[in-house]
Amino acid sequence: MAQVKAEYDFQSQPNTGELSISAGEVLTVIRENIDGGWIEGRNVRGSVGLFPESYVTPYQASRPPPVLPPPLPPTSSGPPAASSRPFDDWGGASEVAAPPSYGAQHHHQPTPSVPEVTRSSYPSQNDDFDDEWTDEDDEQEPTRPNVQSSIGSNSRRDLSRSHSEHGGPDRGSNKVNKNINRFSNFVKSGVEAYVIGESKTTSQISERHEVVMNNGIIQWKPIQQYYTCIVDKPKKESKLKGLKSFIAYSITSSLTNIQRQVSRRYKHFDWLHEQLSAKYVLIPIPPLPEKQVAGRYEEDLIDHRKHILQLWVNKICRHPVLSQSEVWLHFISCTDEKDWKNGKRRAEKDEYIGGAFLNCITVPHQPLDPNNVDMQVERFQRSVKTSEEAMRVMQERMNMFQKVFAGPVKQNWQKMGSAFKTLQQSFEIDETVASRRLTEALAYTASEYHEIGQVFDAHTKNDMEPVLENLYSYKGTVQNVPDIIQVHKQAVQKFRDSEGRLSSAEAEKMKQRIDAMSYTVIAEVQHQTAEKVEDMKSTMGTYLKKQAMFYQEVATKLTSLAARYD
């Protein structure tokens, strides 16, 4: 196989499938001419990944240097001359090119919507259960900047992909001269390798899923056994003799006859989200609650996070693929520390992630009409775009209602209560029986008006907050849809570009892989569309019922007050 030599250091970004290389390092080329100016290669340690093509030069092992004759004896018996070896030989030469500034301003995405080719290059090396996570506790890390303001104040992921403006070096001048797209998701997710039939896997498939045709509708095979998971009992815990503290949540699943309860931290949820995002490349993973530090142990914050986690768990349980995911089932059921660590390692070394996961999906044999596929995907994309805008407007109005009800409306009711109290005090001077009855009625009215103000405040949390949480969950899920659709479009285009250069047999096999990918995308479109309808029916129906109960409660109080003046 061809080899190349690194001319510059290149530092990989986490969770991208890139491979760090050092100047002078010799690498074996696996695949060249990858979109965006990349090479896939292997280093001497066996790690595989992508690195910029313009950072390396072709390398051929040179022949050993000829054996030189022994040096002539010195002609002088004086002390040896000081060595004239230049400082350059020690790595400090002034002529050594400075490494390029590639990626210096690269914007890191916590959970790319379409993840890396492989995680096997980054296995966990630590056997300690707690220390397998970073030393910084999840509850005490600095708040991540919220770069996705378009999704709302509680958004967690970045809607728009960042693209690096930096490229590789010019070998003559050591300056950047070529733009390299670090977010070539079609390549890095392994989808390109799948499309061209070069997915590299050595292990057997342990998790299989199926797309079926039901009355002409393409969909995931329905769930055979529905189950639920409850996120509850948030509890403050600590480690290192109290130096680090965090909130742990219990998860109780109905999957088995015996309800099993496990305890998980937010950091564990975050790890699971990363595994799901990496493996299920064409499935938008719902968002977790945002990580926050300020007031992290306040009751309202803990309760809010618990509700978002519950929504997240609900969506996973309802998904025909995610609900049967091995890493998910391990997450909700494993109580043994040793088994947990082994399962964690298995997930991190899983070969069937990204594009390779498509090998785990069985689809109908019937070929798909490309035009019909394009039409369905485009319609879904338009639906997502219009729904996002509509939900943004709903989110803004609901936020406004919350502020008004918890602020001016509550205050005005309670100010009216104070006015009734003042009126009551003015009638206390009269000592007649009639005035005494009126005084009692006014005093009770003042108290009830104050209570109605509190009811308006509670309404914002109990009735409005769930709507906002559901809007957050939906928008955080579909924000990944544009990237998924883009990867599908690139796969289809790859086939169209290659079709004329392939034999009929090769073209047919490639078309089958494209069809399998299209079946998967349409099945997911069908699921997401059905979920949106059911979620919105349930959310708005529940909200309006609570609205009616709320106003009935206020009306009942006012009717009762009016009767006191009869």
From Swiss-Prot:
Residues 143-154 have a biased composition (Polar residues). It is found in: Cytoplasm; Cytoplasmic vesicle, Phagosome membrane. SUPFAM superfamilies: PX domain, SH3-domain. GO terms for cellular component: cytoplasm; cytoplasmic vesicle; early phagosome; phagocytic vesicle; phagocytic vesicle membrane; plasma membrane. GO terms for biological process: endocytosis; endosomal transport; execution phase of apoptosis; mitotic cell cycle; phagolysosome assembly involved in apoptotic cell clearance; phagosome maturation involved in apoptotic cell clearance; phagosome-lysosome fusion involved in apoptotic cell clearance; plasma membrane tubulation. Changing R501E: Defective recruitment to the phagosome. Changing K494E: Defective recruitment to the phagosome. PROSITE patterns: PX (PS50195), SH3 (PS50002). Pfam families: BAR_3_WASP_bdg, PX, SH3_9. Residues 1-61 form the SH3 domain. Residues 63-77 have a biased composition (Pro residues). Signal peptide: none annotated. Residues 155-173 have a biased composition (Basic and acidic residues). Expressed in vulval precursor cells (VPCs) and apoptotic germ cells. Colocalizes with actin, dyn-1 and rab-5 in early phagosomes. Disruption phenotype: Aberrant vulval development, ectopic vulval induction, retained cell corpses and defective recruitment of dyn-1 and rab-7 to phagosomal surfaces. GO terms for molecular function: GTPase binding; phosphatase binding; phosphatidylinositol binding; phosphatidylinositol-3,4,5-trisphosphate binding; phosphatidylinositol-4,5-bisphosphate binding. Residues 227-339 form the PX domain. Keywords: Cytoplasm, Cytoplasmic vesicle, Lipid-binding, Membrane, SH3 domain. Residues 59-179 are annotated as: Disordered. Residues 127-140 have a biased composition (Acidic residues). Residues 362-566 form the BAR domain. Involved in the signaling of vulval development by acting as a negative regulator of epidermal growth factor receptor (EGFR) signaling. Aids in phagosomal membrane tubule formation which is required for phagosomal fusion with endosomes and lysosomes. Also recruits rab-7 to phagosomes by an interaction with dyn-1. These are events leading to phagosome maturation which is a step in apoptotic cell corpse clearance. Binds phosphatidylinositol-3,4,5-trisphosphate. Homodimer. Isoform d interacts (via SH3 domain) with dyn-1. PANTHER family: SORTING NEXIN. Belongs to the sorting nexin family. This is Sorting nexin lst-4. It comes from Caenorhabditis elegans.
